[in-house]
Amino acid sequence: MRKISYDSAEKFMNAEPFKRDNTEVVVLLNVTVLKLFGNEIAYRYNDLERTLSITNCGWETNTTKDRLNAIEGVSINQSKKVWHLNGNAWDGKLIDINK
């Protein structure tokens, strides 16, 4: 895992602003957003459950996978061109992650 992925995930989970190269964490009133090349790939809502939602925004790249894998509770791997999220086939569309 690249250092930028680790650093951005740490800031994302702690709701702290971050910007380096192509990766940014934006903290809003109700949600913290992780962006990669301007695409919003993860959301952490400021609700009681601290809901975490992710998407690959249609970009099945190693960089997208690396940024998402750095987030606690997210494990993405690829087999025969199919992405698997926490052990289940995943189409990359927005999904809530259960803790």
Give the ranges of each region predicted by the language model.
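Terminal leader/tail segments of proteins
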Residues: 1-99
